């Protein structure tokens, strides 16, 4: 089977894609958590910035931090493992875009939870993607999950993103 011939490539690619998702979500959260830790809420909300401007700044800063972390991994993947993520072609951009939108949306939901529940919600900020990873079928097809978990997994965009990544790599 092509899947087993490309096992290293499939696992590495999914690991890189998941790392990008994790970085985009946690970068969004970290920027807001730093405001909580430094007790800088007063300065943040007194500044003449609209909420949309704060969200836009968090979004672009999270993208920049994600790219700084992921580009070296993509570059080093080929010389060390003989796998090139760039061979996926144009669909790679759409996969990264989908993961970034999901990560940023999750980051926005966690940030709203931090605003509502305070620092006690910090555990959710760190664990949200680790909780979703088994249901997101990052490293394996959805068919491996029990039927009742498949029903839950079908509600997550992650399943379809990683299934498509595996499909592109195998075919």
Predicted regions located by residue number:
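Hydrophobic alpha-helical transmembrane segments of multi-pass membrane transport proteins
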Residues: 8-78
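Alpha-helical transmembrane segments and their short interhelical loops
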Residues: 51, 56-124
